[in-house]
Amino acid sequence: MCKPTLKVFSLTIILNKTTAYLFGLLIFMIASISYGHGTDSPIVIKTVDWQTEQIGEIRSYFSKEVKIQRVEGKKCVTGALLNFYVRDSYAFDIDELVQVEVEFDLGKSSAEIILQYDKNGNPENTKRLALPQNGKHRWYRHTFMLERARFSGRHIGNEFGGSLFSTPGVFVNGDFYIAGADNAQITVCDITLKRSNTSPQPTAYGDLFLKLLDENGSQVPGRVGLYDTTGRMPQPGKEAVLFKYVDEEFTNVVILNSSSITWPVRTRKAFYIDGSYHAKLPVGRYQIVVAKGIEYRTLHKNFSIEADKKTSLTMNLSRWVNMPAKGWYSGDVHIHTSRSNNQDNLRIRLHAHAEDLNVSNLLQMGDNKAFYFQQYSWGKTAQYGDAPYTLVPGQEDPRTGERGHTIQLNINEPVRQPERYYLYHQVFDQIRQQGGVTGYAHVNDLTWGLGSLTGLALDVPFGLVDFVEVLQLGRASTSPWFDFLNLGYKLSPAAGTDFPADVVGAVRSYVQTGEEFSVQRWFDGLKAGRTFVTNGPMLEFTVNGKSMGSEVYVRSGDLLEIKATATINPEIANLERIQLFRQGEMLA
């Protein structure tokens, strides 16, 4: 496996008069540049009454304007993102070239078209088309060639840049989708599919029995990739763990390009198991990959399945670093998944345990009309799980494009004021009265993140903000955070995946709780600044013997002794350098 280079470690010291604030706190790998989802509308999922002999259903995501209309006798569908489900009777779980001929209405379509599909887990699954703009013809037909199309309706995934959302496939569960670039509308009036009928047809099967054990010999959940010699992952069996993507349950998890630095194969499909797994597989050679968060070594092994025979595998997981043993516990401050009963608790906690994520903040998302990803209960009684894996409800609300998206953690009950929706400070005040922790999501200096910068400028000077989410989708944005630190404001950094926009815990906040772990100590540490954010590397950092989150009082000319140690799983990356920043400028 080729090791990617660790691009940046960043430590920050903010000197304010005679106080040195230790916001060293940031350590990250830049895997790719991605953008936030950038819409304040809820995740609108609308089933459209538009079918053909081969297309059974269309769903429109993130678009309230989707509509059906007759144009010159043609039945056309218009929307920003149209997700197509192929009838199972025509094609299901295949692996072959498929031609998709699409007719566009040029008068009502974006100049650039994007088609994305499940290329049997291959990340190179995006087709782009520039529509002609000469105005001579209204109708335009184009044939997309989909190599290794799967059509299993099991989560598309992957990324492309755009102002609406960074990873549209993450929210899209279907066979393929067609979208206009930058959330522009498209109009589709006809689609015809033509199969090559070259998919391999297995004739014999064997049984796989798999167990995952941790360093103590205990059976533990984990993430599993299982691939044949072509890189294809067979559909997970019934024993795979179900989890929700927006409104549907799936077993497949998609590992985004921005999170793939810790995944040693190109295929981006995987699934979760509770520690044991049995499935029937076609005869042949396979590679298995097993991961359990970023503190464990990733395992991979080749094996064979023989006809009518049993193959048993035991994968022994081990840590390359043990952060809890050092008093540091991980958390994801930004997860969207609904909970309605204890069965949901069991499922979600198992998901977090499989990623070795200690604190999972499940955010009920709101706008000025309603809440989404609803939580069935609040407060300490709604916190589920024994240490060290706990689910904690919170909210992402208020959230607007003008003032940004806010996050409220460790709250006793949601705070919602539709009639005063832009008065964020009133929400922060009420959250503080509950003992909650307040912050801003998606804090970056790109595109729609400007809304968060406006909100921060209004709320930080009044001491209403505890943290800023600076690491997401494999990209850290330090400039806005540095600006506030340089002015003397203490703001903790935080990391959140915005699941389902990324694998839970792909980026995470580590908080120092000391020898004893509790949920309250974790949130106290986050608020106090005893934290760093990462998507793989680990950090130790002191100034004059004081650790992260401390204040060091110095005089002009005093000598500062700075000690920093950065480590990274040697199996996945090479350490290149450590950077030290002061007042936003690199010192070393």
Q: Which sequence ranges carry the predicted segments?
A:
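Beta-strand-rich domain onsets/edges
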Residues: 194-207, 213-217
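C-terminal functional module detector
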Residues: 212-248, 252-279, 285, 290-322, ...
